[in-house]
C-alpha cells in the first residue's frame, strides 16, 4: 500500500477522490466525502482539487435547497447555473450563492428573467407544482424559461427523495422535461432517472433511466401546460410501473435461479450458535 501511495501523484489522488464523490449514492455525500477525506489525508488538496466534483454532484442530483426568507425549495441544476457559484430561482426571480460542500444558499438578490417566456413558464410551473404535490410526497420542481438558439424553451425539473439511513436505504427520483414554444405542435423530450441504494446485509444499487419523446399540441399557455402535464404523468406512471413489475419478475425468477434462499439443509445458520454446529466444532479443532 505504501508503495502504491508513493507512485500516485497528488493529481491522480484527487482524480480518484473526485470519482468517488461524483458517484456517491443519494443522501450519502457526507459519508463518502468523510471517507475520502480520511484516505486522502490532505484537506486543502481535497477542497481545491475536488471542488468541481462537489458541484457536479449537486448539479447531477438536482439537489434541493431552501433559501432563507422564501417558502419553496429550488433545485440546483445546470439550467439555473449562472456561473461563479450563483444560481437562479426562476419562481421568485432571485439569484443566490450556493455552497456546494455545505449545500447552503446565501445572499439572495433580485434577478432578471426572460420576460418573453415568463407567462409560459409560469403556466407550466403552476400545473407542474400541482402534479408534483399529488404524486411526490417530498417532491420539488423548478421550471425555467429561456431562449436557446433563438427559440423560446421551457425546461421542467422534478426531484423527489427518501433518505432512510436507519433502515439502510436511500433513493432519489429525477426527471427533466424540455420543449420549445412553436406554433401548432412541438416535440417534448424527457429523461427519467431512478437511483436507489440498499445496504443492509449487502450492497445493492438500482440505477435506471429512460428517454422520452412525445408530441405536444401548442395553443394558449394554460391549455398547453395542461397537455404537457398529461404527457409527463403518463410517461412517469408507465416508467414506475415497468420498474416495479420488472423487479418483481426478477425476484420471482432470475434471483431465485441464481441462488437458493436457504442452503441445502433448508435451515439458516445462526452465527451466534456456530460452535454448537458440527462445522463449528470442526473449525474449532482445526
Swiss-Prot record:
GO terms for molecular function: actin filament binding. It comes from Macaca fascicularis (Crab-eating macaque). Component of the F-actin capping complex, composed of a heterodimer of an alpha and a beta subunit. Component of the WASH complex, composed of F-actin-capping protein subunit alpha (CAPZA1, CAPZA2 or CAPZA3), F-actin-capping protein subunit beta (CAPZB), WASHC1, WASHC2, WASHC3, WASHC4 and WASHC5. Interacts with RCSD1/CAPZIP. The modification Phosphoserine is found at residue 9. The lineage of its organism: Eukaryota, Metazoa, Chordata, Craniata, Vertebrata. F-actin-capping proteins bind in a Ca(2+)-independent manner to the fast growing ends of actin filaments (barbed end) thereby blocking the exchange of subunits at these ends. Unlike other capping proteins (such as gelsolin and severin), these proteins do not sever actin filaments. This is F-actin-capping protein subunit alpha-2. Belongs to the F-actin-capping protein alpha subunit family. Coiled coil: none annotated. The modification N-acetylalanine is found at residue 2. The gene is CAPZA2. One of its GO terms (cellular component) is cortical cytoskeleton. One of its GO terms (biological process) is barbed-end actin filament capping. Keywords: Acetylation, Actin capping, Actin-binding, Phosphoprotein.
